């Protein structure tokens, strides 16, 4: 690809948020939350310690950008996947509200398991 003049960094710059974008979002009143560090698609298959590391590194990164006193209280489960260890880890990190990626009913759900519809589900439902 490089021999054709394609720079991977140029596509990264166009696709992904940078630290400045995150500051802009916060300054506009948006709430930033955790989503993991490496976005494991089956985070619920990781050990409790691996899950804690995923979310703790994500939290540390956000605080390093936003300032150490920044409150990060929200999160969204990667691919809607989680288990009891995940919920315990998140509570231990001070996370108060979490979102799943579908609207299915979860009996006895907590504030860390709120339903929301993922855009991929919506696109699939309307046939785009």
Describe each region flagged by the PLM:
Residues 1-28, 64, 71:
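Active-site beta->alpha N-cap acidic-glycine motif
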Residues 2-5, 35-41:
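Short glycine/proline-rich turn/loop motifs
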Residues 37, 44-128:
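C-terminal active-site subregion of NodB/CE4 polysaccharide deacetylases
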Residues 16-35, 52, 91-92:
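Acidic (Asp/Glu)-rich catalytic clusters
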